[in-house]
Amino acid sequence: YPENSFAEIAQFCRWRYISLSEYVELNEGPGIWDFLAEVWQTMKQAVADGLAAEGTLPGGLNVERKAKRLYAQSKENERPQVRELRIVCAYAFAVSEQNADNGTIVTAPTCGSAGVLPAVLLYMQRTHNIPDAQVLRALAVAGLFGALVKRNGSISGAECGCQAEIGTACSMAAAALCALMGLSIEETEYAAEIAMEHHLGLTCDPICGLVQIPCIERNAVAAKRAMDAFNLSGLLCGSRNISFDMVVRTMKETGLHISAKYRETSEGGLAKLYDRRAAN
């Protein structure tokens, strides 16, 4: 995109009286909607495939697929907040388990963080009967924020730790929720900033180098955190002090100072201390 920061994009949108999704269309052309329709269909299929699958994931860690069981584990008189948690997390598990089993997923922004965005969007669509066309607008906004992080920060766990992957996914999902539910540009920025800020410093230490532990569960937690960021942004936007651009720069600087042991090498953290014999 011609603008280099979110501040520049927001200023341009205000000047032209357009939304963030309209900004994306202005730069990408109308063909972007056909592309995003394919993206959305692939995301929904990944959730469906993951919810239908059972068994153990490949790789030797004996990680059981949990999405199907989680999705079906409703209880009588289940509280609404528990149901939301269960369904959103089941969707995130489904996509992440498909990724771990060489299934077809959409990088958002990476394979290891692919479960966050489809989980929150599909839950909101089904809960509020939102048409696909509106979801595509939200996907456009998610992609815009992901592109900004890629340009000014990093989306690579090998470069900046898991904050760069799951933190970006959480920001994209929070921004998408704002677009989906009609929040302002300022509220959208704030949600994306909250989502990234509270992943700062997160390490990438996959056990045995597999995108399973802690990666799959982390997608579910980040999906819920994106929903929290979305809700908070609508309540507190007027009193914020940190911009999205600032938190992205902070993430990049933080990531470059994280030891290489905690940047996808599996030489530190959980990957180092995990004892497969004790776990089994």
Q: What would you call each of these model-derived segments?
A:
Residues 122-126, 153, 157, 168, ...:
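Amphipathic, positively biased hydrophobic alpha-helical segments used for protein targeting
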Residues 175-280:
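Functionally critical mobile loop/hinge segments
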